[in-house]
């Protein structure tokens, strides 16, 4: 390795189950494991929030569930990137990051297919009046007389 310091990446502790197995087995960092210039370490948040102290020696953070707010920003000024594993910035104080020059990114492609499948499912359920029909079935014999009103719809 050169004299240059390693690029250190903190991975949200939420990427691991309690037994240490990965939550997302397909999120494989194996190909980077032998790279001498990159170092990965799992960092667990405290009370659902990343702590500044645990991030002092990192250049980047791959964030899953924990919150990252103004109090999470390390004083070392080394942290340059937060890659939010998911969509939305609801768990990241973007303004605080902007003020400290920390770039924040998301991964929208990761949820496009599941969101599309959910939307299509809702369209089919609503157009077929699934909720009304579900209530009729759950209502038992007392609601059976109403079934005729919904025949041929959906």
Language-model features: locations:
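Short, acidic/turn-prone active-site loops that include or flank metal/cofactor-
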Residues: 15-16, 85-89, 109-112
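Rossmann-fold NAD(P)-binding glycine/threonine-rich loop
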Residues: 90-100
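Rossmann-fold NAD(P) dinucleotide-binding segment
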Residues: 67-79
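N-terminal glycine-/charge-rich "phosphate-binding" loop or analogous flexible N-terminal tail
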Residues: 1-58
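Phosphate-binding beta-alpha-beta segment of Rossmann-like dinucleotide-binding domains, i.e.
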Residues: 100, 108-154
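Short acidic/histidine-rich motifs immediately flanking catalytic phosphotransfer sites
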Residues: 55-60, 77-79
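Short beta->alpha connector loops
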Residues: 44-47, 64-68, 86-89
């Amino acid at each position: 390795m050169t004299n240059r310091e390693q690029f250190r990446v903190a991975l949200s502790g939420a990427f691991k189950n309690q037994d240490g197995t990965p939550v997302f087995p397909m999120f494989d960092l194996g190909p980077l494991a032998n790279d001498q210039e990159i170092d990965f370490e799992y960092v667990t948040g405290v009370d659902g929030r990343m702590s500044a102290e645990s991030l002092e020696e990192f250049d980047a953070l791959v964030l899953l569930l924990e919150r990252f707010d103004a109090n999470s920003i390390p004083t070392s000024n080394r942290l340059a990137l937060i890659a939010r594993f998911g969509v939305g910035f609801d768990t990241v104080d973007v303004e605080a990051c902007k003020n400290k020059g920390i770039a924040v990114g998301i991964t929208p492609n990761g949820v496009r297919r599941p969101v599309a499948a959910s939307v299509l499912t809702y369209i089919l359920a609503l157009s077929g009046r699934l909720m009304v029909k579900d209530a009729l079935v759950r209502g038992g014999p007392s609601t059976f007389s109403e079934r005729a009103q919904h025949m041929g719809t959906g």
